[in-house]
Amino acid sequence: MNTPLRAGLIGLGMMGRHHARILSQLPGVQLVAAADSSGDPHHAAANIPVVANVEQLLAHRLDYCVVAVPTADHAQIGFALAAAGIPALIEKPLAPDLATARALAVAFDAAGLIAAVGHTERYNPALRALRARLADGALGTLYQISTRRQGPYPPRVRDVGVVFDLATHDLDVTTWVTGMPLVSLAARTVARSGRIAEDLVVILGELSDGTVTSHLVNWLSPLKERVTTATGANGCLAADTVHGDLTFYANGSAKTEWAAAEVFRGVTEGDITRYAIPKREPLLGEHEAFRDAILGKDAPIVTLWQAAATIAAAEAVLTSATTGGTAAPEQPRIPRPRLASDYALATTDPSSR
Protein backbone atom coordinates (compact mmCIF):
# COMPACT_ATOMS: atom_id res chain seq x y z
CA MET A 1 0.00 0.00 0.00
CA ASN A 2 1.42 3.41 -0.95
CA THR A 3 2.27 5.79 1.86
CA PRO A 4 0.04 8.91 1.80
CA LEU A 5 1.68 12.26 1.16
CA ARG A 6 2.02 14.24 4.38
CA ALA A 7 0.46 17.66 3.81
CA GLY A 8 0.58 20.76 5.97
CA LEU A 9 -1.63 23.85 5.83
CA ILE A 10 -0.67 27.39 6.81
CA GLY A 11 -3.68 29.62 7.43
CA LEU A 12 -7.05 28.55 8.82
CA GLY A 13 -9.09 31.61 7.86
CA MET A 14 -11.96 31.96 5.40
CA MET A 15 -10.04 30.30 2.57
CA GLY A 16 -7.88 28.03 4.69
CA ARG A 17 -10.90 26.24 6.11
CA HIS A 18 -11.86 25.12 2.59
CA HIS A 19 -8.34 23.88 1.93
CA ALA A 20 -8.53 21.94 5.22
CA ARG A 21 -11.81 20.33 4.14
CA ILE A 22 -10.36 19.20 0.80
CA LEU A 23 -7.05 18.01 2.25
CA SER A 24 -8.86 15.98 4.90
CA GLN A 25 -10.70 14.01 2.19
CA LEU A 26 -8.16 13.89 -0.65
CA PRO A 27 -7.17 10.34 -1.60
CA GLY A 28 -3.47 9.66 -1.26
CA VAL A 29 -2.96 12.61 1.10
CA GLN A 30 -2.92 12.94 4.88
CA LEU A 31 -3.32 16.39 6.44
CA VAL A 32 -0.95 16.04 9.38
CA ALA A 33 -0.82 19.55 10.88
CA ALA A 34 -1.81 23.17 10.37
CA ALA A 35 -0.35 26.51 11.43
CA ASP A 36 -2.14 29.73 12.30
CA SER A 37 -1.13 32.32 14.88
CA SER A 38 -4.83 32.89 15.61
CA GLY A 39 -5.59 29.24 16.23
CA ASP A 40 -8.50 27.56 14.46
CA PRO A 41 -11.41 30.05 14.44
CA HIS A 42 -13.58 27.96 12.08
CA HIS A 43 -12.81 24.59 13.71
CA ALA A 44 -11.49 23.34 10.37
CA ALA A 45 -8.49 21.37 11.67
CA ALA A 46 -10.32 18.53 13.39
CA ASN A 47 -8.06 15.95 15.04
CA ILE A 48 -4.75 17.42 13.85
CA PRO A 49 -2.23 19.62 15.68
CA VAL A 50 -2.49 23.38 15.16
CA VAL A 51 0.79 25.21 15.72
CA ALA A 52 1.65 28.90 15.69
CA ASN A 53 4.06 29.28 12.78
CA VAL A 54 5.79 27.71 9.80
CA GLU A 55 8.87 26.74 11.78
CA GLN A 56 6.79 24.59 14.14
CA LEU A 57 4.86 23.14 11.20
CA LEU A 58 8.07 21.95 9.53
CA ALA A 59 8.70 19.62 12.47
CA HIS A 60 5.86 17.40 11.17
CA ARG A 61 7.93 15.97 8.26
CA LEU A 62 5.86 17.44 5.44
CA ASP A 63 5.89 16.26 1.84
CA TYR A 64 4.20 19.49 0.76
CA CYS A 65 2.40 22.50 2.17
CA VAL A 66 -0.59 24.67 1.25
CA VAL A 67 -0.29 28.39 1.99
CA ALA A 68 -3.56 30.23 2.64
CA VAL A 69 -2.50 33.39 4.47
CA PRO A 70 -2.84 37.07 3.48
CA THR A 71 -0.90 38.03 0.35
CA ALA A 72 1.55 40.16 2.34
CA ASP A 73 2.75 37.03 4.17
CA HIS A 74 3.29 34.83 1.09
CA ALA A 75 6.91 35.81 0.61
CA GLN A 76 8.13 35.12 4.15
CA ILE A 77 6.41 31.74 4.28
CA GLY A 78 7.26 30.82 0.68
CA PHE A 79 10.97 31.48 1.14
CA ALA A 80 10.96 29.46 4.37
CA LEU A 81 9.35 26.49 2.63
CA ALA A 82 11.74 26.69 -0.33
CA ALA A 83 14.73 26.80 2.03
CA ALA A 84 13.36 23.74 3.87
CA GLY A 85 12.88 21.79 0.62
CA ILE A 86 9.08 21.68 0.87
CA PRO A 87 6.93 21.99 -2.30
CA ALA A 88 4.13 24.53 -1.91
CA LEU A 89 0.69 25.36 -3.26
CA ILE A 90 0.29 29.09 -2.57
CA GLU A 91 -3.02 30.94 -2.71
CA LYS A 92 -3.44 33.67 -5.32
CA PRO A 93 -2.30 36.32 -5.82
CA LEU A 94 1.21 34.94 -5.52
CA ALA A 95 2.70 38.18 -4.19
CA PRO A 96 1.90 41.87 -3.69
CA ASP A 97 4.29 42.89 -6.49
CA LEU A 98 6.14 41.47 -9.48
CA ALA A 99 9.60 41.62 -7.93
CA THR A 100 8.51 39.43 -5.01
CA ALA A 101 6.66 37.03 -7.31
CA ARG A 102 9.78 36.59 -9.41
CA ALA A 103 11.94 36.06 -6.34
CA LEU A 104 9.62 33.31 -5.11
CA ALA A 105 9.68 31.60 -8.51
CA VAL A 106 13.47 31.72 -8.56
CA ALA A 107 13.71 30.34 -5.01
CA PHE A 108 11.60 27.26 -5.74
CA ASP A 109 13.31 26.70 -9.10
CA ALA A 110 16.73 26.90 -7.49
CA ALA A 111 15.68 24.31 -4.91
CA GLY A 112 14.32 22.00 -7.64
CA LEU A 113 10.88 22.03 -6.03
CA ILE A 114 7.39 21.85 -7.45
CA ALA A 115 5.36 24.95 -6.59
CA ALA A 116 2.00 26.19 -7.80
CA VAL A 117 -0.45 29.02 -7.27
CA GLY A 118 -4.15 28.63 -6.49
CA HIS A 119 -5.75 30.22 -9.54
CA THR A 120 -8.83 28.12 -8.89
CA GLU A 121 -10.80 29.40 -11.86
CA ARG A 122 -8.60 27.34 -14.18
CA TYR A 123 -10.31 24.29 -12.67
CA ASN A 124 -13.85 25.62 -13.08
CA PRO A 125 -15.70 23.16 -15.33
CA ALA A 126 -17.33 25.92 -17.40
CA LEU A 127 -14.00 27.61 -18.15
CA ARG A 128 -12.26 24.34 -18.90
CA ALA A 129 -15.01 23.53 -21.41
CA LEU A 130 -14.76 27.05 -22.87
CA ARG A 131 -11.00 26.71 -23.32
CA ALA A 132 -11.37 23.33 -25.03
CA ARG A 133 -13.98 24.64 -27.48
CA LEU A 134 -11.87 27.69 -28.32
CA ALA A 135 -8.94 25.37 -29.01
CA ASP A 136 -11.18 23.32 -31.31
CA GLY A 137 -12.07 26.45 -33.28
CA ALA A 138 -15.74 26.53 -32.28
CA LEU A 139 -15.91 30.32 -32.68
CA GLY A 140 -13.67 30.67 -35.72
CA THR A 141 -11.73 33.92 -35.55
CA LEU A 142 -11.83 35.24 -31.98
CA TYR A 143 -12.91 38.87 -31.59
CA GLN A 144 -13.32 39.52 -27.87
CA ILE A 145 -13.07 38.08 -24.37
CA SER A 146 -15.15 39.88 -21.75
CA THR A 147 -15.68 39.14 -18.07
CA ARG A 148 -17.94 40.40 -15.31
CA ARG A 149 -17.03 39.62 -11.70
CA GLN A 150 -18.97 41.61 -9.17
CA GLY A 151 -20.65 41.18 -5.81
CA PRO A 152 -20.59 42.33 -2.18
CA TYR A 153 -17.32 43.07 -0.39
CA PRO A 154 -15.76 39.90 1.13
CA PRO A 155 -14.68 40.63 4.74
CA ARG A 156 -11.81 38.12 4.39
CA VAL A 157 -9.84 40.60 2.21
CA ARG A 158 -7.95 43.26 4.15
CA ASP A 159 -4.54 43.68 2.50
CA VAL A 160 -5.18 44.16 -1.24
CA GLY A 161 -7.68 45.91 -3.47
CA VAL A 162 -10.09 44.42 -5.96
CA VAL A 163 -7.46 44.38 -8.74
CA PHE A 164 -5.11 41.97 -6.97
CA ASP A 165 -7.80 39.94 -5.21
CA LEU A 166 -10.43 39.50 -7.95
CA ALA A 167 -9.24 40.94 -11.26
CA THR A 168 -6.23 38.63 -11.17
CA HIS A 169 -8.72 35.80 -11.76
CA ASP A 170 -9.92 37.44 -14.97
CA LEU A 171 -6.49 38.48 -16.20
CA ASP A 172 -5.22 34.93 -15.69
CA VAL A 173 -8.29 33.25 -17.21
CA THR A 174 -8.17 35.46 -20.30
CA THR A 175 -4.61 34.50 -21.17
CA TRP A 176 -5.17 30.86 -20.20
CA VAL A 177 -8.30 30.20 -22.29
CA THR A 178 -6.81 31.92 -25.35
CA GLY A 179 -3.17 30.89 -24.97
CA MET A 180 -2.07 34.48 -25.67
CA PRO A 181 -0.48 37.15 -23.46
CA LEU A 182 -1.93 40.56 -22.72
CA VAL A 183 0.15 43.24 -24.42
CA SER A 184 -1.78 46.41 -23.55
CA LEU A 185 -4.08 47.45 -20.71
CA ALA A 186 -6.08 50.55 -19.85
CA ALA A 187 -8.07 50.86 -16.64
CA ARG A 188 -10.05 53.10 -14.32
CA THR A 189 -10.54 52.45 -10.61
CA VAL A 190 -12.58 53.99 -7.81
CA ALA A 191 -12.74 53.55 -4.03
CA ARG A 192 -16.24 53.97 -2.66
CA SER A 193 -16.52 51.72 0.39
CA GLY A 194 -14.28 53.71 2.73
CA ARG A 195 -11.19 51.59 2.14
CA ILE A 196 -7.92 53.01 0.87
CA ALA A 197 -7.59 50.40 -1.85
CA GLU A 198 -9.76 50.38 -4.98
CA ASP A 199 -13.02 48.45 -4.89
CA LEU A 200 -14.09 48.83 -8.53
CA VAL A 201 -12.10 48.52 -11.73
CA VAL A 202 -12.96 48.61 -15.42
CA ILE A 203 -10.24 47.21 -17.70
CA LEU A 204 -9.82 47.30 -21.46
CA GLY A 205 -7.05 45.13 -22.88
CA GLU A 206 -5.53 43.68 -26.02
CA LEU A 207 -4.05 40.23 -26.59
CA SER A 208 -1.02 39.59 -28.76
CA ASP A 209 -3.17 38.73 -31.80
CA GLY A 210 -5.29 41.88 -31.50
CA THR A 211 -8.22 40.26 -29.67
CA VAL A 212 -9.96 42.83 -27.46
CA THR A 213 -10.56 42.08 -23.78
CA SER A 214 -12.78 43.83 -21.24
CA HIS A 215 -13.30 43.25 -17.53
CA LEU A 216 -15.77 44.71 -15.03
CA VAL A 217 -14.77 43.85 -11.47
CA ASN A 218 -16.10 45.25 -8.20
CA TRP A 219 -17.01 44.68 -4.55
CA LEU A 220 -19.87 47.18 -4.66
CA SER A 221 -22.77 45.25 -6.17
CA PRO A 222 -25.45 43.24 -4.32
CA LEU A 223 -25.68 41.19 -7.54
CA LYS A 224 -23.16 38.35 -7.54
CA GLU A 225 -22.01 37.73 -11.08
CA ARG A 226 -19.21 35.60 -12.51
CA VAL A 227 -19.42 35.49 -16.31
CA THR A 228 -16.82 35.04 -19.05
CA THR A 229 -17.91 35.54 -22.66
CA ALA A 230 -15.89 34.81 -25.79
CA THR A 231 -17.19 36.29 -29.06
CA GLY A 232 -16.00 35.22 -32.49
CA ALA A 233 -16.95 34.84 -36.12
CA ASN A 234 -19.34 31.94 -35.45
CA GLY A 235 -21.13 33.28 -32.35
CA CYS A 236 -20.28 33.43 -28.68
CA LEU A 237 -19.61 31.14 -25.73
CA ALA A 238 -20.76 32.29 -22.29
CA ALA A 239 -19.39 30.62 -19.15
CA ASP A 240 -21.28 31.09 -15.88
CA THR A 241 -18.67 30.12 -13.34
CA VAL A 242 -21.00 30.37 -10.33
CA HIS A 243 -23.09 27.48 -11.64
CA GLY A 244 -20.51 25.83 -13.90
CA ASP A 245 -22.60 26.29 -17.07
CA LEU A 246 -21.38 26.87 -20.64
CA THR A 247 -23.79 28.14 -23.31
CA PHE A 248 -23.17 28.56 -27.04
CA TYR A 249 -25.05 31.29 -28.93
CA ALA A 250 -24.64 30.54 -32.62
CA ASN A 251 -24.87 33.08 -35.39
CA GLY A 252 -28.02 32.35 -37.38
CA SER A 253 -27.89 30.95 -40.88
CA ALA A 254 -31.33 32.22 -41.91
CA LYS A 255 -31.29 35.30 -44.11
CA THR A 256 -33.07 38.41 -42.86
CA GLU A 257 -35.66 39.48 -45.41
CA TRP A 258 -36.44 42.72 -43.63
CA ALA A 259 -33.83 45.05 -45.10
CA ALA A 260 -34.18 47.76 -42.47
CA ALA A 261 -33.47 45.29 -39.66
CA GLU A 262 -30.53 43.70 -41.49
CA VAL A 263 -28.74 47.05 -41.64
CA PHE A 264 -28.62 47.31 -37.86
CA ARG A 265 -28.06 43.69 -36.82
CA GLY A 266 -24.87 42.49 -38.48
CA VAL A 267 -25.48 38.86 -37.44
CA THR A 268 -28.71 36.99 -36.83
CA GLU A 269 -29.74 34.94 -33.81
CA GLY A 270 -29.18 31.23 -34.25
CA ASP A 271 -29.46 28.16 -32.06
CA ILE A 272 -28.72 28.37 -28.34
CA THR A 273 -27.08 25.32 -26.74
CA ARG A 274 -26.29 24.80 -23.08
CA TYR A 275 -23.74 22.03 -22.85
CA ALA A 276 -23.99 19.18 -20.40
CA ILE A 277 -20.57 19.14 -18.74
CA PRO A 278 -19.29 17.29 -15.65
CA LYS A 279 -19.35 19.63 -12.65
CA ARG A 280 -16.66 19.08 -10.06
CA GLU A 281 -15.61 21.49 -7.34
CA PRO A 282 -12.77 23.65 -8.74
CA LEU A 283 -10.81 23.63 -5.47
CA LEU A 284 -10.86 19.83 -5.45
CA GLY A 285 -9.50 19.80 -9.00
CA GLU A 286 -6.75 22.21 -7.97
CA HIS A 287 -5.67 19.95 -5.10
CA GLU A 288 -5.82 16.81 -7.22
CA ALA A 289 -3.57 18.44 -9.82
CA PHE A 290 -0.99 19.50 -7.23
CA ARG A 291 -1.02 16.09 -5.55
CA ASP A 292 -0.46 14.43 -8.93
CA ALA A 293 2.38 16.84 -9.74
CA ILE A 294 4.06 15.93 -6.44
CA LEU A 295 3.75 12.27 -7.42
CA GLY A 296 5.55 12.96 -10.71
CA LYS A 297 2.51 12.86 -12.96
CA ASP A 298 1.73 15.26 -15.80
CA ALA A 299 -0.73 17.60 -14.07
CA PRO A 300 -2.15 21.02 -15.01
CA ILE A 301 -0.77 23.14 -12.20
CA VAL A 302 -0.37 26.93 -12.39
CA THR A 303 3.35 27.59 -12.08
CA LEU A 304 4.84 30.47 -10.12
CA TRP A 305 6.13 31.98 -13.35
CA GLN A 306 2.64 31.91 -14.87
CA ALA A 307 1.28 33.53 -11.72
CA ALA A 308 4.03 36.17 -11.92
CA ALA A 309 2.81 37.10 -15.41
CA THR A 310 -0.62 37.73 -13.92
CA ILE A 311 0.94 39.94 -11.23
CA ALA A 312 2.66 41.90 -14.01
CA ALA A 313 -0.72 42.44 -15.68
CA ALA A 314 -2.29 43.57 -12.40
CA GLU A 315 0.52 46.07 -11.88
CA ALA A 316 -0.06 47.41 -15.41
CA VAL A 317 -3.77 47.84 -14.58
CA LEU A 318 -2.94 49.92 -11.51
CA THR A 319 -0.33 51.92 -13.44
CA SER A 320 -2.90 52.74 -16.10
CA ALA A 321 -5.47 53.74 -13.49
CA THR A 322 -2.93 56.07 -11.88
CA THR A 323 -1.57 57.69 -15.04
CA GLY A 324 -4.73 57.71 -17.12
CA GLY A 325 -2.93 56.13 -20.08
CA THR A 326 -2.33 52.61 -21.33
CA ALA A 327 0.30 50.30 -19.88
CA ALA A 328 2.12 47.27 -21.27
CA PRO A 329 2.53 44.42 -18.78
CA GLU A 330 6.12 43.44 -18.17
CA GLN A 331 6.58 39.89 -19.42
CA PRO A 332 8.38 37.78 -16.79
CA ARG A 333 10.72 35.10 -18.06
CA ILE A 334 8.67 31.90 -18.13
CA PRO A 335 10.91 28.82 -18.33
CA ARG A 336 9.91 25.80 -20.35
CA PRO A 337 7.44 23.44 -18.61
CA ARG A 338 9.52 21.15 -16.46
CA LEU A 339 9.24 17.38 -16.54
CA ALA A 340 8.56 15.40 -13.40
CA SER A 341 12.09 14.02 -13.64
CA ASP A 342 13.46 17.55 -13.30
CA TYR A 343 12.22 17.78 -9.73
CA ALA A 344 14.09 16.27 -6.84
CA LEU A 345 10.92 15.15 -5.09
CA ALA A 346 9.70 13.14 -8.09
CA THR A 347 12.42 10.57 -7.46
CA THR A 348 12.20 10.68 -3.68
CA ASP A 349 10.17 8.30 -1.55
CA PRO A 350 7.75 10.61 0.32
CA SER A 351 7.93 8.42 3.40
CA SER A 352 11.64 9.20 3.72
CA ARG A 353 11.02 12.91 4.34
Residue spans for each PLM region:
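C-terminal glycine/acidic-rich active-site capping loop/insertion
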Residues: T120, N234-I301, W305, A327, ...
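Hydrophobic residues in well-ordered beta-strands that form the structural core
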Residues: I90, A115-V117, A239
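Short, Asp-centered acidic motifs that coordinate Mg2+ and/or phosphate
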Residues: A33, Y64, P87, Q144, ...
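Beta-loop-alpha module in the N-terminal Rossmann-like domain of NAD(P)-dependent dehydrogenases
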Residues: H19, P49-A107
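A contiguous active-site-proximal alpha/beta segment in oxidoreductase catalytic domains
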Residues: A95-V157
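Rossmann-like dinucleotide-binding domain that binds NAD(P)(H)
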Residues: P154-V212, L216-L223, T229, W305
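N-terminal Rossmann-like dinucleotide-binding module
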Residues: M1-A46
